[in-house]
Amino acid sequence: MGLKIHRPRRGSMAYYPRKRASDIVPRIRNWPVIDLGKPTLLGFVGYKAGMVHVTVVDDRKTSPFFGKELVKAVTVVETPPLYVVGLRAYAINPLKAELVSVGEAWVNIPNEVRKYIARRIPTLPEKFDTDKALADLQGLLDSVSYIKVIAMTQPYKAGVGKKTPEVLEIPVGGVPTIDEQFKYASGLLGKEVKPTDVFKPGQLVDVIGVTKGKGTQGVIKRFGVKELPRWHKHRKGSRRTGTVGPKPAVMYTQPRMGQMGFHRRTEYNKRILKISDNGSEITPKGGFKHYGIVRSGYMLIEGSTPGVVKRLIAFRYPIRPPFNYDLKQVQAPSVTWVSVMGVSGVS
């Protein structure tokens, strides 16, 4: 007879509840603690443009293909620079074990940038006393646990066809002392941050995004339940479960129809193959399908990433890297060829 496999569903219970994400901009709940010897932002964001394939020299010394060219599928993520509009300091409330904002400082935003961020924050004041706010924060650093910059995306510099930016907080890390983090964040106020200021080619990152939405789906597509034979004893349907159990208590483990897709998901330890400021070198003939032209810088991420094109994807330093991974000894891979074949097949 052999082993009888009991598989009531193919969907993992680790992803419950399977409901729609609260926001299309992914929220990052945890950040790693890293030591680089210099301060840096712990994350970055970009817009998914599409996928291409490249040839890259395998640099894994334990691989049987070491030193040989491999064909890999990669995701092109357009990364227009972030504009830092402020910083915020947080302290830990010992009674509730939660972060509490103790102060913030905003920069006087120039008019060419203000007209865009006003779409997201209509009540933004005209002027800020940045020096006074920074001086007040300087006196509170003894009680501060985290320093985060307030950054806005610049989609009007990308090919996504939108002008309203997203405003998000990105913590500062890389050094253990708050004084160094505060000094670094203060120096970023009113400046642009590029992906090369945060990451470097060859390193691993965690990719956080909202997956492609598929609406309401049945148990066959949603959980991979085995379809029943179509004969007279299954007159109540074949694309359904045989039984949901006795009433009135139906177990939450029972596969049911419902929302599929548009979930916030994290993919760990994706490798950055390339970072460049020249988007024209990666744009296929005729542009990316449903996206267009990469107008600013871009990153090549090995493999696939969650979400559809034009969707915002967040990157952070790896929170659970391999045991033999050293951030200080990252080597850039050798990308020898990139496919820029257009949709029509014309290269």
From Swiss-Prot:
Pfam families: Ribosomal_L3
PROSITE patterns referenced in this protein's UniProt entry, alphabetically: RIBOSOMAL_L3 (PS00474)
GO terms for biological process, alphabetical: translation
One GO CC term on file: cytosolic large ribosomal subunit
Domain of life: Archaea
GO molecular function, one term: structural constituent of ribosome
Keywords associated with the record: Ribonucleoprotein, Ribosomal protein, RNA-binding, rRNA-binding
Keyword Ribonucleoprotein in record: yes
Keyword Protease: no
Binding partners and assembly: Part of the 50S ribosomal subunit. Forms a cluster with proteins L14 and L24e.
Function comment: One of the primary rRNA binding proteins, it binds directly near the 3'-end of the 23S rRNA, where it nucleates assembly of the 50S subunit.
Family the entry assigns: Belongs to the universal ribosomal protein uL3 family.
This protein's name: Large ribosomal subunit protein uL3
Lineage of the organism: Archaea, Thermoproteota, Thermoprotei, Thermoproteales, Thermoproteaceae
